[in-house]
Amino acid sequence: MAKQKIRIRLKAYEHRILDQSADKIVETAKRTGATISGPIPLPTERTLYTVIRSPHKYKDSREQFEMRTHKRLIDIVNPTPKTVDSLMKLDLPSGVDIEIKL
């Protein structure tokens, strides 16, 4: 029988909230008896926006804004039914995007 694996990808703009969420997931999975690999930090995605400061002219005067998206990857190997139930009931902050693949 093939091993089951749950892959969880977390994305957030704030790395502190992201790390807290990853710690909650890892602690919950370990408490229920699953094997964990991670959290693995993935490359930070950086989006840069350049805008002209004035509304009409002075094109040489520009301002740059950036948005950083931090990512983490957690693999849960051989999850028990108890692990899946406890992960479904877990409350995480609203600024974290979660992608789960079975």
From Swiss-Prot:
Keywords: Ribonucleoprotein, Ribosomal protein. The keyword Ribosomal protein applies. Coiled coil: none annotated. Pfam families: Ribosomal_S10 (PF00338). One of its GO terms (molecular function) is structural constituent of ribosome. The keyword Ribosomal protein applies. InterPro entries: Ribosomal_uS10 (IPR001848), Ribosomal_uS10_CS (IPR018268), Ribosomal_uS10_dom (IPR027486), Ribosomal_uS10_dom_sf (IPR036838). One of its GO terms (biological process) is translation. Signal peptide: none annotated. GO terms for cellular component: ribonucleoprotein complex; ribosome. Part of the 30S ribosomal subunit. Belongs to the universal ribosomal protein uS10 family. Involved in the binding of tRNA to the ribosomes. This is Small ribosomal subunit protein uS10. It comes from Ligilactobacillus salivarius (strain UCC118).
